[in-house]
Amino acid sequence: RDVAPSRGLGDVYKRQENTYPCLYIPVYQNNNYLFRVTYYRKRINLEVFHVLTDGMGGITFLRELVYEYLRLTHDDLMEKLGDELCSDTSLNKEDSYVKNYTGKKYKKKYKTERAVRLTGEFLPPKALSVTHGYLNIPILKAKAKEYGVSINTFLTGIFAYSIYKEHLHSQPYKKPISICVPVNLRPFYGSITTKNFFGMTAAVLRADKENYTVEEVIARIDESLKEQITKENMDSLISYNVSNQKNLMLRMVPLFVKNLAMKWVYRSSALANTSTVTNVGSLQIREDYRPYIDKMHVVLSMTKGQNMKCSISSYEDTLVYTISSKLKDQSIQKCFFRTLSELGVPVTIETNGEAYEVL
């Protein structure tokens, strides 16, 4: 919403958005910061390199940044609230992976089976198609309940169905549709760290027959995720990652060899997923600031092997499902939102201008 400044901010460096989102951040032209803050009209943007933090940490920082901006531009807020960090803003920077490492051995490996890749004609270099779908949470929750699944599983299932229908044309295929679903590990371990603390799961659909129905796909995705989102599986993820870090033999390997190995691991892991769907949860805003905040979006950048990604964010009674893509073809986006509408979930769509045909 419009925030009219009530005091001068001329001494504060401000950068207006003038490019597509999620472009490369040239560190040496950005004061060596691995994040970038810009604005556009009524919107404040934060772009973060994942090495700094995950979605929860990024949202915590952005929320505190917006709070500070509102206090600076509204004298009544500054007088009432002072110039302190919000009481529920964590400054904890512990390595929760190491803290929760038990040393127990698990037979855990990252999968390397290649998945379906979304390919086609690309948009111009640096261009990114961004489509937001606004959904009413009470209606969406009731519909997901009809299928006996969570909202996250319901939406991931419809996205997998859209890939199956539009990209595979409802035909069998030897490679699986594998959608990476990051899991926030903080609730599992009682952590409040602002550093990265998440685990990777995969919602897998094996297209082994023709004409799957949306109900069948949602059920397959639900089964796939339930097998993985367990405390024991999260323990195994932490154990696998931290044990490699603590392995003395691996620590003695020359850095250039490690770099080559990491590139191979990254490439193998990237090609094992068709896309990503990440849910950053509900944005919690203090009552005093709510009149000034209207909505929140999350946009994911593209990575090797993944030319389309999705993010889910919520504020009050509205959920925003965002699809970012560097492909010209918008058939998957259209199928996704049309399927939701056909199932009785109204959708309001907004795009950045690269995907008008979705409307």
Model-derived segments and spans:
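Helical lid/core segments from catalytic subdomains that handle acyl or acyl-like groups
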Residues: V130, F197-G281, D288
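Structural preference for long, well-ordered alpha-helical segments in enzyme cores
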Residues: R1, G58-L65, L140, I151-I163, ...
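Non-catalytic, low-complexity flexible loops and terminal extensions
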Residues: R43, L52-T60, E64-A142, L340-L359
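Acidic/histidine-rich catalytic neighborhood
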Residues: I177-E210
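Gly/Ser/Thr-rich phosphate-binding loops and adjoining beta-strand/alpha-helix segments
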Residues: N31-I44, L118-R186, T318-L319
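Single conserved hydrophobic/aromatic residue that forms the stacking wall/gate
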Residues: D2-Y13
